[in-house]
From Swiss-Prot:
GO terms for cellular component: chloroplast thylakoid membrane; photosystem II reaction center. Residues 1-24 form a propeptide. PSII is composed of 1 copy each of membrane proteins PsbA, PsbB, PsbC, PsbD, PsbE, PsbF, PsbH, PsbI, PsbJ, PsbK, PsbL, PsbM, PsbT, PsbX, PsbY, PsbZ, Psb30/Ycf12, at least 3 peripheral proteins of the oxygen-evolving complex and a large number of cofactors. It forms dimeric complexes. The chain crosses the membrane at residues 4-24. PANTHER family: PHOTOSYSTEM II REACTION CENTER PROTEIN K (PTHR35325:SF1), PTHR35325. This is Photosystem II reaction center protein K. It is found in: Plastid, Chloroplast thylakoid membrane. Belongs to the PsbK family. The keyword NADP does not apply. InterPro entries: PSII_PsbK, PSII_PsbK_sf. One of the components of the core complex of photosystem II (PSII). PSII is a light-driven water:plastoquinone oxidoreductase that uses light energy to abstract electrons from H(2)O, generating O(2) and a proton gradient subsequently used for ATP formation. It consists of a core antenna complex that captures photons, and an electron transfer chain that converts photonic excitation into a charge separation. It is a single-pass membrane protein.
Amino acid sequence: MLNIFSLVCICINSALYSSSFFLGKLPEAYAFLNPIVDFMPVIPLL
């Protein structure tokens, strides 16, 4: 069960990184996604 949860978190994490990469040229969108992108890599390590 923990492995499935970790896999889902990694998928969400990669999706957020790709979306933040495309939205990086928009300062407002990047400022909105920045706290989420900073927090998400911690979740699979828990």
